[in-house]
Amino acid sequence: MAKRGKKYVEAAKLVDRAAAYSATEAVELVKKTNTAKFDATVEAAFRLGVDPKKADQQIRGAVVLPHGTGKVQRVLVFAKGEKAKEAEAAGADFVGDTDYIGKIQQGWFDFDVVVATPDMMGEVGKLGRVLGPKGLMPNPKTGTVTFDVTKAVNEIKAGKVEYRVDKAGNIHVPIGKVSFEDAKLVENFKTIADTLLKVKPSAAKGTYMKNVTVASTMGPGVRVDVSTLA
């Protein structure tokens, strides 16, 4: 295990590891314990009582955070004809069809999110081995395979985040930057928590939200009382 820096160790002393803080208190602590010299991202981590190995307990989707993430997302849209024009008008950073497939195969990745119209997925599917491991493959569950490219681009630019449970039952989601007002971080935090509660698989047994923590990029994790996220 990597040795923690002096600043991190000092910051961690401010957090009671045995306590579960309210969402508001946790956000305040995250700011106090942030040791980064840049505007660090604040990330929420949810440990869920699901078995991702079972198809009916896999959780994946997307939600628009009311105050965005603080990051400007570069959007690539695979579309042609009128849909390509709509994507450009909506503010997509890159719009094209097969020309971008060749660029990506050659190692071009100057984008953060990929959207594709359903009729383009036959071609985009060729990029599965490249985009899949990076979490960039368009998917209907996250609203990135759609003919409504205007809505898709607008939502991404407005602060839409994707969530997906990993093999251990965890979901990590950015909820903003340390420069955000406390109230905005809390509202974003509650929005993603509420979304995850709504998509709870009916097959999941026992406690659903087992543990929730929030932390800045280089700061210690702060445990959150789940009841304060309602």
Swiss-Prot record:
GO terms for biological process: regulation of translation; translation. Keywords: Repressor, Ribonucleoprotein, Ribosomal protein, RNA-binding, rRNA-binding, Translation regulation, tRNA-binding. GO terms for molecular function: rRNA binding; structural constituent of ribosome; tRNA binding. One of its GO terms (cellular component) is large ribosomal subunit. InterPro entries: Ribosom_uL1_bac-type, Ribosomal_uL1, Ribosomal_uL1-like, Ribosomal_uL1/biogenesis, Ribosomal_uL1_3-a/b-sand, Ribosomal_uL1_CS. Belongs to the universal ribosomal protein uL1 family. Part of the 50S ribosomal subunit. HAMAP family: Ribosomal_uL1_B. Binds directly to 23S rRNA. The L1 stalk is quite mobile in the ribosome, and is involved in E site tRNA release. Protein L1 is also a translational repressor protein, it controls the translation of the L11 operon by binding to its mRNA. PANTHER family: 54S RIBOSOMAL PROTEIN L1, MITOCHONDRIAL, LARGE RIBOSOMAL SUBUNIT PROTEIN UL1M. This is Large ribosomal subunit protein uL1.
